[in-house]
Amino acid sequence: MPVLHNRISNKELKARMLAETQPRTTISFYKYFNILNPLDFRNSLYQQFTDLSVFGRVYIAKEGINAQISLPTHNLEAFKALLYSVDPALDNLRLNIALDDDGKSFWVLRMKVRDRVVADGIDDETFDPSKTGEYLKAEQVNQMLDNPDTLFVDMRNHYEYEVGHFENAIEVPSDTFREQLPMVAEMLQDNKDKNIVMYCTGGIRCEKASAYMLHNGFKNVYHVEGGIIEYARKAREQGLPVRFVGKNFVFDERMGERISDDVIAHCHQCGVSCDSHTNCKNEGCHLLFIQCPECATKFEGCCSEMCREEVRLPETEQRARRAGRENGAKIFNKSRHRLQDGLNSTSLQSVE
């Protein structure tokens, strides 16, 4: 029986990926459709994806599939043929090709079965996710941005919005999609006569959000087809003004795609203009924050003095402390809230 999960260490896999000389292409895709047996579906796909040297993150649920992957560029056409043949619902599925890609986005294939492909927290039997808002193509997006009766709503996390967003877009200040859904319906309760345009990175969150808004009585609901990635690609191809400002955060090793030259965020430690996310080098912390090159040097890639001191300890001692043998789980504060504490303030959001 073939092995249907990885058995090689992350360290070795990453080293192999970095040593690769063949070009790789990073793509993302999703589809809401009915999967009767997600585990069987997953196991079949895992072997076929492995045969094509696919790396990345794939979530499968009864409601569909959500994937961010990379693969050797010469395997792209074979991958399309495979994906389109898996189920009629996936025939000619749109693939979002990364905008700013060095091919080093992933180094291992992780394919998981989940309850939902996007954790939405919706527990309402009357909710129909197939009743979604209207798609907007790039030219229509730009027209809507100039319409005073239209509100653009960013359905991404706060740290994504911080480094880039559409002009005048509304932020729904939360760390999770499940929190955002009821929040945005409440925030816009007095704007049901407006056009509501929802967007996210690749389309999967805003598609479900548009259905949620319609379910809650909003009438004129739209979502950006293919999300930020497809919008920026089509706008460039068609010679349209790109109205997304800054960087598009992505959940892989790149941590961002440059959409415009604007840098709209600031280093969380010193406040200088910067939009480069990193994870704290302390493995017991691993917090996501924005850090400029100067602070990266000063703090040795860490979010605080405490974490810098931690990474200087022998590795065996660090592992013991992470296991809680010395001070338990309170050694590091993994709060999701930002701290404003002088030089060492940081956004304490972990990518998990």
Curated annotation (Swiss-Prot):
Key words of the record: Oxidoreductase, tRNA processing
* Purpose: Catalyzes oxygen-dependent 5-hydroxyuridine (ho5U) modification at position 34 in tRNAs.
Q: Where is the composition biased (Basic and acidic residues)?
A: 315-328
Instruction: Give the organism the record lists.
Output: Photorhabdus laumondii subsp. laumondii (strain DSM 15139 / CIP 105565 / TT01) (Photorhabdus luminescens subsp. laumondii)
The family database entries (InterPro entries) matched by this protein are listed as: Rhodanese-like_dom, Rhodanese-like_dom_sf, Rhodanese_C, TrhO, TRHO_N
Outline the segment boundaries, as ranges, of region: Disordered: 315-352
EC numbers for this chain: 1.14.-.-
| UniProt domain Rhodanese: residue ranges | 146-240
Please name the Pfam families in this protein's record. Rhodanese, Rhodanese_C, UPF0176_N
Q: What protein name applies here? A: tRNA uridine(34) hydroxylase
**GO MF annotation, one:** oxidoreductase activity, acting on paired donors, with incorporation or reduction of molecular oxygen
Sorted alphabetically, which HAMAP family does this protein's record hold? TrhO
Instruction: Show the active-site residues.
Output: C200
The entry's family comment says: Belongs to the TrhO family.
The Gene Ontology biological process annotation of the record reads: tRNA modification
Its ancestry begins with: Bacteria, Pseudomonadati, Pseudomonadota, Gammaproteobacteria, Enterobacterales
Q: Where is the composition biased (Polar residues)?
A: 342-352
Reactions listed under catalytic activity: uridine(34) in tRNA + AH2 + O2 = 5-hydroxyuridine(34) in tRNA + A + H2O
